[in-house]
Structures are given as structure tokens and as C-alpha cells.
Swiss-Prot record:
Its main location: membrane. Keywords: Cell inner membrane, Cell membrane, Membrane, Transmembrane, Transmembrane helix, Transport. One of its GO terms (cellular component) is plasma membrane. Pfam families: ACR_tran. It comes from the Bacteria. InterPro entries: AcrB_DN_DC_subdom, Acrflvin-R, Multidrug-R_MdtB. SUPFAM superfamilies: Multidrug efflux transporter AcrB pore domain, PN1, PN2, PC1 and PC2 subdomains, Multidrug efflux transporter AcrB TolC docking domain, DN and DC subdomains, Multidrug efflux transporter AcrB transmembrane domain. It comes from Klebsiella pneumoniae subsp. pneumoniae (strain ATCC 700721 / MGH 78578). GO terms for molecular function: xenobiotic transmembrane transporter activity. The chain crosses the membrane at residues 16-36, 342-362, 369-389, 396-416, 440-460, 472-492, 537-557, 863-883, 888-908, 911-931, 968-988, 998-1018. NCBIfam families: PRK10503.1, RND_permease_2. This is Multidrug resistance protein MdtB.
């Protein structure tokens, strides 16, 4: 029995059907706006969601971690803690360096944060040590964000000190000026300097001290104003030879006289041109190098920034000698571009598959062209809105457009199928278009707004995850909205002009065969549907079981935060015993580097040893392993990491921690592994008590891998205990003691050499090669009040102690970070549960506070809001459907399709070994919007048949199911094929796209089968319930 359409006159589509020229030009305008907008859209890996972050670095060479903490970090933290909009403040105080990282609220502009930081630094200046070589320097950069570009500068003919000087003045400064660059660091520590190495025995023999030498040097090298002479006729500027420029000048410097004979600096010290810090070194593929790391500002577009650097590099390298080679070792934009290209290909493949399925069902070229035009028009038109909203072409927006391919064609399919049905019945194309479009208009509006309603909760997600998916949700919603407009305007107009009874009746052998196939399928479906309607309670039991199963799967499926991406770059930390020297650490780094470079997947390697703003201690080395492009290696990054760690396990005395770089960086500190867990206390003593037991328990957990802590309190220290009474009797102050020690062992920067292009330091130290270790303290001499020379050992004793290698703070309190990775056979959710269980078993005191950080903290936050996100999507859709249908009952019938989609998605994820992460959850939310389309198409026609033809509910829903079977199948397959390329993705960034495709394909497959039977049964059950309520509560009939 055929359901007859109501007599309508085209509704909102009538104007566009009757005015084809205006409609065509309107669509051309949308197309041109999208094409123009596409050209202005920037390209990036992900939407820009970085927290405004500023790093403040203060260098104090020779200072211990305790001194750096109390003299530099603490005063700065007190001022920074008063800034408004500050989200988190972390600091690391190591030997000679203080690094404070300030993370602000997402809503605070970075420029405003910069002004607050500068004001806080100015306020703290008076509290900082007076002998700081340089004031605190801030950079608009997140230290945990990997460099966007790494360059290695090498030379076999020129000393590395000269190479660094050229690179710093000619290359690094120019790159720093590029828009979007936050910080350019030169790893390698080869800044030119004049190094003065005192001979302790020679000084002692001459009755001098290191302080005498320091004072002589600082007094002999000055660069200050001298004034000018203003005569009656002319003015003369005064200058003098007050500066010493070379090591030879310093060798000839007279530091004292003895018996009338001059004592020159060269008599008591070796003076040479060298590096400012001899305990820093960088290597590129085992060759000594200056490694230039370029980091972007938070929020800057990585592609634009890298392109600008690439454009200026040829000009910059031309200014360097030919023997100096500049090599780009890593460029994160290479993988970003490859990932975007792969996603663009998947988008085009999805479009092709969707058009193919349309032709398969319609078996008519003109009828296929119409939705074939609607798809690209809807997608391209979206670009214009994206430009207006300052979006970018990134993996998430392209994923949204790929998924939208299956969505946007649905509306056109529903319109074409309905109009074609009237043409086949003998209606004229124009009359059929008016009648079909008018009849289906409300359905299109229902489909569109109910689907957009699902996306509304994504727009209100908080914190960084909400920012991340805002572009995804808005892009998808815009594409769907444009699709609805196209389907109600262009599609019926084209149907009126391109379709005819003859074109639809024209069939070839394939068309006839496929028609017979579909007729048989519909007949089989009709027979099964009759049986199902005869056993409604059994079908209802199946529907309820899917709901129960979806809840069970939701609870037990492994959960994660964000897929681990293979971006072709691995960040590594090499850990050695805490008392290791620079030379020993450099040799261990060389051994490990030679092993890593032998791996077939590795293309290049940079490594760094020493203490600076990113590396807290000498016993740590930083590595960056650059892999070959994905199509040139056999293994993904996680496999390569496992292989490298196994290979390095054979090197004694080192531990290697590796993690792949990610496009999404939430952390604010450089970590050894992917995830972090912190312990915070009021004192370092409390941490020293509780960190070891917790660390040992976590290392025994199978859910965790590479567990380590940054708590290092076994560094060797020489504690010099001065007899203050004896020192006072001799007229020696504690300042005299500190100065003597600093002069000998602190690589003290005692003077500055000024040139037209740069400034260079004079470094003072004691030559310890003859007397290494603690014996060098016996050579320290002090001057008493009567001018006598007093050895340090006469007034002090030396004790060996252990000391922390660094002191870390979080929001001004001591903290230690436990880093961990998750093994392949476990999920982040299971790892988090294991950590919480270990924490509870230890029963921490109240002054110990624990918290996950970075990605693991974001995972906890996202996990807590996931259920509410799904509930909000369902509630939003119920409200929209209730308003559209003016009914409390029919939206429930439509929403009854959701459990089947949830079960299908969760089963697919489980079978594929994929975690339920935020990407997969977005897929499930989209399924909520997709699968209800089946029910809407059925219920709309059933209600029309009841209302306008007087059919009983069972006959109405039965006929509606048969009548809408083909468009339901078409739209579901279109959505499925739109997601299929994502599920089968294998290229760069596939880890990000695959969970979305798996969840959607699995959910669509199962829901397509079940909802064809469960929806009509639930429709009839609710119809009976409605009648029962009307009889029992006749006064509420209208409300029901």
C-alpha cells in the first residue's frame, strides 16, 4: 500500500524552484566565497589551543641549586604569584640556572601576560643578587613544546667558538625577528670568551690571592663614559685604551709588583681564547655542533612561521664562510603537511565513495549529478565561514569535512528520492519538485537542527579540550547547515530541470538487475518486519539489552586521552649516576648516540650535555631523534622506541627515556616521558621521605613503564664549614670566603669585552688539572686584615654530603614529578587507576598533595565530563525534536536508536584494540546525530499517513518503513563510506583519524540493521502508551 503525500505547494523551496537563475547565481556566490576563503586559510596540525605561556630564565654560573632557589627563584615567584590570570607556576632551580614557567588562563591575551611578567621582574630586581651576570630574561614560549625546527651548524675548519659567534649575530637574531618565533636557543655552549685559569701554586708562591687577580682584571678592563672637551672653536670627544680585546692583552696585564718587578697575569695563569662555559656541549650525528632550536610563540601558526624561516635561510647562510655548514635536521611542518595532505586525500576519497553509492542506488546519471553538486558546494562554502571565524585547515577541521561528506549528501538524497518517486508516478518534473520538496521540507529541517543540536555540547566543553574541538564542531555544523540550504534550494530546482519520467525510466542491464535486487531486499525486509511487529516485546528486549550492553562496554573498555601520534621525532633523556662529570657524561652520550644512529629508522640525531635553561643537571643529556619519513621506514614510532631502548640497555650506567613528540602539548615542563604525576609538600624533607616508597611501588606496576622521578638528592657536595671565630680574628669575612671559592670553581664572569657587534666575557677559574677533586680546596688562599695570606684549610673544614641536583617548585611549594609511559597492552585509564591505588596504599600525611599533570590531568578532566557530554547531547537533541514535533513522546521514539549505535561503536573500538579516547567519544556523539535520521524519516511519513490518510498506526509505520527503506539505506551507507577512509587511514596522522572512523563505521553498521526493526516496534508501543494516557487523563489530551 502506497503512502500518498500531502498536497503542498513547495513550501520554502518554491521561490528557488521557480527562479532557477537567481538560485544558480546564489550557489555560484557561495562557491566563489568558499574558494577565495580557502586561499586565505592557514594550515596547521591542530586548532590553536595553546595556553598563554611565558618562560623566565635567570643564569647565575657557579651557584648551587639551594642558592639559586633562595636568591633568585623565590623572589621572582613571590612577585609572579601576585599576577592576575595566572593558572600555574612551576620552577626549576639547578646549578647555575633558574627557570620559571608561567601558564596563564586561556582567556588572557599573551601580550597582557607579557606586560604583567615584565612588571613582576622589575619589582623583584632589588631582591636579586647584585653580581648576576645578566638580569632575568623572559620568552613567550612553552618549554615543553618541541622545537618547530632544529638546525645544526658545523665546521671542520673554524673553531666552534667562532662558529657560534657568527651564528648568534648573523643567523639567530634574524630568525628571532620572524613573526611567530618565541625563542631561538643555541645549544652547545661555545660562546667566545677569554678564559683565565689560575695556577694556584704560582699565586701562593708570590703571596697573592685569586681576589687580587680578579680585582686587577676588572679594574684594567672598563668601557665607560669619558666626556668631551668643548673649546671656543671645536669639540673633542675623549677616548682611551681602557679595554683589552684579546687573550694576549690579558696575558700582558700587570696584576701586582714584587720587589719593584711587575707580575703579569701570564705569570700566574694560562690565558686563552675559549668558550664561556666549558661544561656545555652539543652534537649533531656525533659531530660537535651548534644546535639551533626554534620554538614558536603559543598560538602562532607553525606553518607560516616555518615557511618564513625557510625563505630567509639561504640569504642568512650566504653570510657565513663556506666551511660552515647549516643543516635543517628537523622540521615539524614536514609531517604536518603530510598529515594534512593525507586527510585531504581521504576527504576526496570519501566524496568519490559517496557519489558512487548514490549512483548505485539511483542508477541515473542526472539524478547522481544533483547530490554530486551539493556535496562539494556545501563543503567549499564552509571555507568562507571558517575564514570569518579565524579557523585553519588542520586535521580536525578536515576530519569534520570528511565526516560531513556523508552528512551533507543525506539531505539531497532525501529530497531527490522523494521527488523522483512522484515523477515515476507520472507527475510533471516541476509539479513533482514542488510537491516533493514541500512534503520533505520539514523532515530536512528536523534532520538538520537535531544533528546540529548534538554538536552544541561540544561548544561548551571547558578548558583545552573544549578549545580543541570547537573548530571541529563549528565546521561540521556549518557544513550541515549549508547542506540543508542547498537541499531546499538548489537540489529541487535541479530536479525540476534535469529529471524527467523518461530519464528515470531509462534503464540498462545493470539498472534492471540492481532494481530487481533492491525489490527483493525490500520484500525480504517487509516479511521480517511483519514478524517483528508480531513479537514487539521480544524486540523491545533486544533494544533494552543493547542499552545494557552499551553501559557495560562503556565501563570496561580501555580509556585514553588523545591518540599517540607518529610525527617522526622522538625526544629523549639520557640519565646517568648523579655524581657524573661532564666529560664522563659526554662519553656516555657518544656511546648511546652511536647505537641510535645504527637503527634503520633513524635519519639524524642531536644531543646536548650540560646545565642550561632546559637541562637541570650534568647527569642528564637531551636527545632529539629524527626518524625517516613514514613511507621510508617499516615501523611506527612506538616500535622504534622499544627497539632503541632495548639496544641501549646494554650500555652500563645509563637509562634512556624516550617519547614521541606530539602536536598537542599541554605540559609546561620538559619531561622524560609522556605522562606526569606530582607530589607536592611544604618541605623538601617530606618529599625525601615519601618519594622513594611511592616510586618503588609504581615501578612494580605492570600498567606503567619507564617510571622515573626528577627527585635527585644524591649529588655529591663539599660542605665547607668555616670557623667564624677564627676567621673574624684574622679579619676574614664570609664574603671573602665565598669570593675565593667562586673565583676558583664557579667559572666566574668577571669582566665584559665590548665590541661593535657583540659582547664577550672574561671567565676566571682555577686550573684543577694538577689537583683534581677536593684536594683543589687546599690551594685556596685568603688575605687577612694585616695583609697576610691564610689558607682556607686554616679556618675551615670540609665535609662530604649529598645535595639535590635541582629544586623544583609548583605554585611556590617544593614538588617532585614522577614520569611514566603506558605499555602497549594497557590504557592510560588503567595506568591512572594503578597510580591512585598505590597512592592510597601508602596513606600519605596531609601535607603531601598529589596531582596528575599535563595530558594525564587533562585525561582525568575529560573522563569526568564525558558522560555529561553524551547526556547533554541527548538532552539537546530531545529538546530540539520536542519543539519540532510538538510532542513529548516522538522524540523518545527517535532517541531509542542511540543504544544500538553506542554498542556498535564500542564493540568496533574493542575489536580494533583502540582506546575510548576523546576522538572516539566525538565519533559516538556524532553517531547520536546520524542514527536518529532513520527514525525521523520513518516517523515523519508514518505520522503523515495517519494524519492525512487515516491509516492505523501499525499500517502507517509498516508502509513508512518500506517506503523509506531505500533512502535510509542510502543515507546510512553514505555516512558510513564518508567515515570509511578515516578508519582505513594509514598515513601520517592516521592515529588521530582512525578512532573516529572505527567508532562511526561500527556504530552505523549495527544501528542500520537493528533500528530498521526496533524503531517501528517502539513507535507502536509509545502510540499505545499515548492512547492509554489519553483515556486515563482526558484533561491532558492536548498536552499529550
Amino acid at each position: 500500500m502506497q503512502v500518498l503525500p500531502p498536497g503542498r505547494t513547495g513550501g520554502p523551496s518554491r521561490l528557488f524552484i521557480m527562479r532557477p537563475v537567481a538560485t544558480t547565481l546564489l550557489m555560484v556566490a557561495i562557491l566563489l566565497a568558499g574558494i577565495i576563503g580557502y586561499r586565505f586559510l592557514p594550515v596547521s596540525a591542530l586548532p590553536e589551543v595553546d595556553y598563554p605561556t611565558i618562560q623566565v630564565v635567570t643564569l647565575y654560573p657557579g651557584a648551587s641549586p639551594d642558592v639559586v632557589t633562595s636568591a633568585i627563584t623565590a623572589p621572582l615567584e613571590r612577585q609572579f604569584g601576585q599576577m592576575s590570570g595566572l593558572k600555574q607556576m612551576s620552577s626549576q632551580s639547578s646549578g647555575g640556572a633558574s627557570v620559571v614557567t608561567l601558564q596563564f588562563q586561556l582567556t588572557l591575551p599573551l601580550d597582557v601576560a607579557e606586560q604583567e611578567v615584565q612588571a613582576a621582574i622589575n619589582a623583584a630586581t632589588n631582591l636579586l643578587p647584585s653580581d648576576l651576570p645578566n638580569p632575568p630574561v623572559y620568552s613567550k614560549v612553552n618549554p615543553a613544546d618541541p622545537p618547530i625546527m632544529t638546525l645544526a651548524v658545523t665546521s671542520s675548519a673554524i673553531p666552534m667558538t667562532q662558529v657560534e659567534d657568527m651564528v648568534e649575530t648573523r643567523v639567530a637574531q634574524k630568525i628571532s625577528q620572524v613573526s611567530g618565533v618565541g625563542l631561538v636557543t643555541l645549544a652547545g655552549g661555545q660562546r667566545p670568551a677569554v678564559r683565565v685559569k689560575l695556577n694556584a701554586q704560582a699565586i701562593a708562591a708570590l703571596g697573592l690571592t685569586s681576589e687580587t687577580v680578579r680585582t686587577a682584571i676588572t679594574s684594567a678592563n672598563v668601557n665607560s663614559a669619558k666626556g668631551s672637551l668643548d673649546g671656543p672653536a671645536r669639540a673633542v670627544t675623549l677616548s682611551a685604551n681602557d679595554q683589552m680585546q684579546s687573550a694576549e692583552d690579558y696575558r700582558r696585564l700587570i696584576i701586582a709588583y714584587q720587589n719593584g718587578a711587575p707580575i703579569r697575569l701570564g705569570d700566574v695563569a694560562s690565558v686563552e681564547q675559549g668558550a664561556e662555559n666549558s661544561w656545555l656541549g652539543a652534537w649533531a650525528n656525533q659531530q660537535r655542533a651548534i644546535v639551533m632550536n626554534v620554538q614558536r610563540q603559543p598560538g602562532a601558526n607553525i606553518i607560516d612561521t616555518a615557511d618564513s624561516i625557510r625563505q630567509m635561510l639561504p640569504q642568512l647562510t650566504e653570510s657565513l664562510p663556506k666551511s660552515v655548514k647549516v643543516q635543517v635536521l628537523s622540521d615539524r611542518t614536514t609531517n604536518i603537511r603530510a598529515s594534512v595532505r593525507d586527510t585531504q586525500f581521504e576527504l576526496m576519497l570519501a566524496i568519490a565513495l559517496v557519489v558512487m553509492i548514490i549512483y548505485l542506488f539511483l542508477r541515473n546519471v542526472p539524478a547522481t549529478i544533483i547530490p554530486g553538486v551539493a556535496v562539494p558546494l556545501s563543503l567549499v562554502g564552509t571555507f568562507a565561514v571558517m575564514v570569518f571565524l579565524d579557523f585553519s585547515i588542520n586535521n580536525l577541521t578536515l576530519m569534520a569535512l570528511t565526516i560531513a561528506t556523508g552528512f551533507v549528501v543525506d539531505d539531497a538524497i532525501v529530497v531527490i528520492e522523494n521527488i523522483s518517486r512522484y515523477i515515476e508516478k507520472g507527475e510533471k518534473p516541476l509539479a513533482a519538485a514542488l510537491k516533493g520538496a514541500g512534503e520533505i521540507g520539514f523532515t530536512i529541517i528536523s534532520l538538520t537542527f537535531s544533528l546540529i543540536a548534538v554538536l552544541i555540547p561540544l561548544l561548551f566543553m571547558g578548558d583545552i579540550v573544549g578549545r580543541l574541538f570547537r573548530e571541529f564542531a563549528v565546521t561540521l555544523a556549518v557544513a550541515i547547515l549549508i547542506s540543508a540550504v542547498v537541499s531546499l534550494t538548489l537540489t529541487p530546482m535541479m530536479c525540476a530541470r534535469m529529471l524527467s519520467h523518461e530519464s528515470l525510466r531509462k534503464q540498462n542491464r545493470f539498472s534492471r538487475a540492481s532494481e530487481r535486487f533492491f525489490e527483493r531486499v525490500i520484500a525480504v525486509y517487509g516479511r521480517w518486519l511483519s514478524r517483528v511487529l508480531n513479537h514487539p516485546w521480544l524486540t523491545l528486549g533486544v533494544a533494552l539489552s543493547t542499552l545494557a550492553l552499551s553501559i557495560i562496554l562503556w565501563v570496561f573498555i580501555p580509556k585514553g586521552f588523545f591518540p599517540i601520534q607518529d610525527n617522526g621525532i622522538i625526544q629523549g633523556t639520557l640519565q646517568a649516576p648523579q655524581s657524573v662529570s661532564f666529560a664522563s657524561m659526554a662519553e656516555r652520550q657518544r656511546q648511546v648516540a652511536s647505537i641510535i644512529l645504527k637503527d634503520p629508522a633513524v635519519e639524524s640525531l642531536t644531543s646536548f650535555v650540560g646545565v642550561d635553561g632546559t637541562n637541570p643537571a650534568l647527569n642528564s643529556a637531551r636527545l632529539q631523534i629524527n626518524l625517516k619519513p613514514l613511507d621510508e621506514r617499516d615501523d611506527r614510532v612506538q616500535t622504534v622506541i622499544s627497539r632503541l631502548q632495548q639496544a641501549v640497555d646494554g650500555v652500563p650506567g645509563v637509562a634512556l627515556y624516550l617519547q614521541p613528540t606530539q602536536d598537542l602539548t599541554i605540559d609546561t615542563t620538559v619531561s622524560r616521558t609522556q605522562y606526569q604525576f606530582t607530589l607536592q609538600a611544604n618541605s623538601l624533607e617530606a618529599l625525601s621521605t615519601w618519594v622513594p616508597p611511592l616510586l618503588s611501588r609504581l615501578q612494580a606496576q605492570p600498567q606503567l613503564a619507564d617510571v622515573s622521578s626528577d627527585w635527585q638528592d644524591k649529588g655529591l657536595a663539599a660542605y665547607i664549614k668555616v670557623d667564624r671565630d677564627s676567621a673574624s680574628r684574622l679579619g676574614i669575612s664570609m664574603a671573602d670566603v665565598d669570593n675565593a671559592l667562586y673565583n676558583a670553581f664557579g667559572q666566574r664572569l668577571i669582566s665584559t669585552i665590548y665590541t661593535q657587534a657583540n659582547q664577550y666575557r672574561v671567565v676566571l677559574e682555577q686550573d684543577t688539572e694538577a689537583t683534581p677533586g677536593l684536594a683543589a680546596l687546599e690551594n685556596i688562599r685568603l688575605t687577612s686584615s694585616d695583609g697576610g695570606i691564610v689558607p682556607l684549610t686554616a679556618i675551615a673544614t670540609v665535609e662530604q654530603r649529598f645535595t639535590p641536583l635541582s629544586v623544583n617548585h609548583l605554585d611556590q611549594f617544593p614538588v617532585t614529578t614522577i614520569s611514566f609511559n603506558v605499555p602497549d597492552n594497557y590504557s592510560l585509564g588503567e595506568a591512572v587507576e594503578a597510580i591512585l591505588a598505590a597512592e592510597q596504599s601508602l596513606d600519605f600525611p596531609t601535607d603531601i598533595r598529589t596531582q596528575f599533570q599535563g595530558s594525564s590531568l587533562a585525561f582525568q578532566s575529560a573522563l569526568g565530563s564525558t558522560v555529561w557530554l553524551v547526556v547533554a547531547a541527548v538532552v539537546a537533541m530531545y529538546i530540539v525534536l520536542g519543539v519540532l514535533y510538538e510532542s513529548f513522546i516522538h522524540p523518545i521514539t527517535i532517541l531509542s536508536t542511540l543504544p544500538t549505535a553506542g554498542v556498535g561503536a564500542l564493540l568496533a573500538l574493542w575489536l580494533a584494540g583502540s582506546e575510548l579516547d576523546v576522538i572516539a567519544i566525538i565519533g559516538i556523539i556524532l553517531l547520536i546525530g546520524i542514527v536518529k535520521k532513520n527514525a525521523i524519516m520513518m516517523i515523519d511519513f508514518a505520522l503523515a499517513a495517519e494524519r492525512e490518510q487515516g491509516m492505523p498506526p501499525r499500517e502507517a509505520i509498516y508502509q513508512a518503513c518500506l517506503l523509506r527503506f531505500r533512502p535510509i539505506l542510502m543515507t546510512t551507507l553514505a555516512a558510513l563510506l564518508g567515515a570509511l577512509p578515516l578508519m582505513l587511514s594509514t598515513g601520517v596522522g592516521a592515529e588521530l583519524r582512525r578512532p573516529l572512523g572505527i567508532g562511526m563505521v561500527g556504530g552505523l553498521m549495527l544501528s542500520q540493521v537493528l533500528t530498521l526493526f526496533t524503531t517501528p516496534v517502539i513507535y507502536l508501543l509509545f502510540d499505545r502508551l499515548s492512547l492509554h494516557l489519553k483515556r486515563r487523563f482526558p484533561r491532558q489530551e492536548e498536552e499529550a
